[in-house]
Amino acid sequence: EADFKDRAAFTDPEILRSSLASVILRMKALRLNDIETFPFVDPPSGRAIADGYHLLQELGAIDPESERPDALTETGRSLAKLPVDPRLGRMILAARDQHCLTEMLIIASALSVQDPRDRPMLAREASDQAHSKFSDDASEFVSYVKLWNWYHEQVKHKESQRKLVALLRTQYLSPLRLREWHDIHSQLMSLVGEQGWRLNKTEATHEQIHLALLSGLLGNLGFKSEEAGHYLGARDIRFLIHPGSK
C-alpha cells in the first residue's frame, strides 16, 4: 500500500521517457527552433538533451567540429528521412552500403519488438532445446535471421492457421510477437522501396552484417576487463554478458 501511494498519479509524458535523439533529428531536419528553446509543455531535462546530442554525434548525424556544429551531416539528413529509431536507421544506411539490407531489415525489425522466443520459468530447458535450432555459433544477431527463415517456411507450408499457431507454441514461440515482427519488417521493406534501395539477392557474410550493426551500436561496444566476467564499455560503464548468451 505504501508503495502504491508513492507512485506518480500519471505516467511521465513520452518526451520525458524516450531518447531525444529522434526528436532533435526531426527538429533539425524541419529547421525548427533548437530543442533547448522549444516551448514544450513538459520540457525535457538538460541531461536528456545532452544524451540525445551525444547519440547523434556517435551516429555521425552531427559533427561538433564542423563550421556549423548544430547542422545535420549528410548521414544525418539521410537518417531524418527514415521514421525509425536513429540507431536502427544508421544500421540500415550502413547495410545499404555493405550490401546486406535483406538480413538487416530482418534484424532491425526484430530489435523493434519484444523477443518472440518464450522462455517460461518452468520450461527453461525445453524452450532452450527448441530454440537451439535457430542459434548461430558466431552471432546472436544472425539467430534472428535463422528464426525468420524457419518461421516463413512454416507459414508457406501451413495446413491451417490453427495448426501453425499450435506448432509455434510447441516451439516456445509467440504467434502474436512473430506477427508484430512481420508487420514491422513489411513497413521497413516499404520504406526501403520508397528510397529506391535494392535488397541483396546473395546471402550476406557475417562480416558485412556486423559492420552494419556496429555503426548503430558504437555505444554498446566493450572490452573484457581484468575482473573475471566483467566488460568495460563507453563512459566507463561495467557490464556482464547475459547468462543466456554464448
Please state what every model-predicted region is.
Residues E1-K246:
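Second RecA-like catalytic domain
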